[in-house]
Amino acid sequence: LVKKERMITLNTQSPLLNKEAKTKLNRWPSWIGYAAIVWSALYGALHLYWLFGGGGYPFKNDGIGAALVSLLPAKVSSIVFVTVCLIGIGVGLVMRKPTYEAFSRWFAIAYSWGFSLTLLLLIPDTKLIAAMAYAFLLKFDFSWQIFNQIICIVGALLWMMTAVVYQRKTRYACEYCGRNNDEEPFFLVRWGRLLTVIAALSPVPYAIVRFAWALDIPLGIDPQLLRDFSSVNPMAHITEMVFGSLCIGGGLLTLGLIQKWGEVFPAWFPFIGGKRVPVMLAVIPASIVAIAVTAAGLTFTFNFITEALHLMPVDNLFISQDWGIAGPMIFWGPWGVALGLAAISYYYRRRGRCSSCGKG
């Protein structure tokens, strides 16, 4: 009986059975590391160009919503990026041949995750989430600064997935799904409901303030400033209403990560009613919003703390005197983190059988 079970296990993981999976374009574990190396080389070369006086340097400290990396002088920032990208090329090459020595393994993992989190949290600023929000008003502001932020987010995702593949390899798990002989579910699955509720409720304070302004209620803001803003911008009331509605609508959609209608389209949906919701249809938008919101929230939280502790000059108009402008954005950090983790939990809960190892 034991021999038969072993034979069955070998057959389900045989190359013949998984031929279809290996011929598809989903062989990302085989090329993701090379993509991260190429990205590091190109972006490092770009910063080398800026280091020697090239034009187009994207990190500008232009106010309270500026990225945290803009606090560094341009020369210092470019030197740091050139150095880190060069190290990344070396680490990436080493990770192509996994080592099982504890120090080497953990250094590669720490570098990959550290670099990716730096690119995600310190590079994007409030321009990214603002551009996404104003797109719903048919206002498109796509500058070089925003494009550079997208480049850095792509690099962060490449290094993040490279780290995931490397960790899976070095613990003898499937590179595609991360499963091994341990059948324990991913730990975030147990926290999925709580994370989703936090992510759904976090934008509510911001929405309340925006709805109040749309109704000419000076909640958390000087009444004269609200009147002046409305007189200068004829679209102010519509803008506030749209921004508040986006937060409430986003919160309701977030609840779909733990609701039945987040797995199967409701029957009243035309054409697709009753069909299963593709996993990535929920994961990808949630992840994009999570990245933008977390970066913006970190920027505002940092400015709020530095102003409160008098560590550096910050425009008091936006933080001290009129808390309604920046106060609700303190919740953006927890909102983004909770939304990102909730999306990961949703993915691991709903993913099916792995086409590579056959487990699931």
Segments and roles (model prediction):
Residues 8-30, 102-106, 169-194, 267-275, ...:
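Membrane-interfacial, low-structure loops and terminal tails that flank and connect transmembrane helices
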Residues 22-154, 166, 343-350:
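An N-terminus-focused feature that recognizes amino-terminal "leader" regions
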Residues 36-47, 111-122, 198-210, 282-299:
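Hydrophobic alpha-helical membrane-insertion segments
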Residues 45-61, 123-135, 208-223, 260-261, ...:
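Membrane-helix interface motif
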Residues 61-68, 134-141, 224-232, 308-324:
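Short, membrane-exposed interhelical loops at transmembrane-helix boundaries
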Residues 64-83, 226-251:
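Transmembrane alpha-helix entry/boundary detector in multi-pass membrane proteins
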Residues 72, 139-154, 189-190, 318-333:
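Individual transmembrane alpha-helices with interfacial aromatic-anchor signatures
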Residues 86-97, 161-172, 250-264:
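Membrane-water interface of transmembrane alpha-helices
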